[in-house]
Amino acid sequence: MKKDLFLISLVSFVFFIFGNWILSLTSLDEGRNFYATLHMLRTGDFIVPYYNCNYRFEKPPMLYWLGSLSFLIFGISEFSARLISGLSAFGTTLLIYFITLKHVSREKALLSALTFPLFIHTWIESRAYVPEFTLVFFSTLGVYLFSIDRFTLGWTALALAFLTKGPVGVILPIGIYLLWRRDLKFLNFKGVLLFILIGFSWYFLMIYKFGFNFFFKFFIFENIYRFTGTYQIHNMPIYFYPLVILVSSILFLPVFLKILKDFDKRLLPFAGWFLLVLVFYSLSKNKLHHYILFSYPALSVIIGFYLTKRYIKYAYIVGSFLLLILMFGVYIYEQKRFTPKAVDFLKNSEPQKLYFYKHENSAIVAYLYRCITKENKFKKGDYVITKKKYLRDFKNYKLLIEGLEFEGKEVLIKVE
């Protein structure tokens, strides 16, 4: 087992953590999360999240708390922020090993655990300062603990998942357990009580401080409205997630034929896990690619069951080559990015009047740790960050910085 765990640790470092510092912060989520974490550290207020001098009610605080701890240990940097996701991915890989070890076999446990880091999607999300992988870790931990009848600890894990992303961190793991075991033994009084005390602690404080405004914004708007489509910003077709999964698991496509041809009944609980997550998020009117991450642990077990040591060896050779190409591409892209160039310029010039126009770059807000408002009217001498396509709205200006970002070219101008 020691050799297995060493191999898993080594692979996880390479595929989840190494090189996470190459790319500077991205907008929108990373910048907002980084700012909120930095604000907590500088103000000592670890209850109320802020971004750009406004309350940030959209996300619970677990990522910010873990990020603050990482900042204190390793310093404030992209590496220490993204390390949270990398370690969460590593922890999830270990859980896949122990789940498979308990319910299948040791040989399949190693193959299943080694499958997970070869999902291309995980290479990206484990290097992003977002809460998704932390949610996957705590949710998977809850499922594992429930499956071995450690219900009190399982509820504690779900409380942490609830503090990471909200209701989804509880609903899906419980749904998976019910599909798996079809009993109510998990309704342990001590465990449920701990869940309420831990999981609801922050929510109670926020509701006490902000009342219905917070309750509506987080529970109604950010969860119910997004799921039902009352508020739509990421409207994708029903086949969106199957497509994401196929691309992510491209190294294992030949194995899918074996799975369909000779499915083993021992994998039914994992098939239920995978399908529940897939169907749940496919029914949501708002779809983002990282929502589907929680299906990957189950898919890893299913795929790993049919792998041979020879197959996984060659898969890692190809996967390592693909990762190297991806990281090299990211390095080249970083040299052309707008954000690092703009941040260097703005830190040196320190303009008093800096605004956004029809656009927002949260990474710049985070790096400068200053409030930048959106405006529509400007005066001579104002500095403005916007997309290049909006330059047509300005008559007289001086172009200071231009560069690439994921949403298109961005510019920094000075109004003349």
UniProtKB/Swiss-Prot annotation:
GO terms for cellular component: plasma membrane. The keyword Protein transport does not apply. Its EC number is 2.-.-.-. One of its GO terms (molecular function) is pentosyltransferase activity. Keywords: Cell membrane, Glycosyltransferase, Membrane, Transferase, Transmembrane, Transmembrane helix. It is an enzyme of class 2 (transferase). InterPro entries: LipidA_mod_glycosyltrf_83 (IPR050297), RgtA/B/C-like (IPR038731). Its main location: membrane. Pfam families: PMT_2. The keyword Nucleus does not apply. It is a multi-pass membrane protein. One of its GO terms (biological process) is lipopolysaccharide biosynthetic process. It is found in: Cell membrane. The chain crosses the membrane at residues 5-25, 84-104, 128-148, 160-180, 192-212, 237-257, 263-283, 288-308, 312-332. Belongs to the glycosyltransferase 83 family. This is Uncharacterized protein aq_1704. The lineage of its organism: Bacteria, Pseudomonadati, Aquificota, Aquificia, Aquificales.
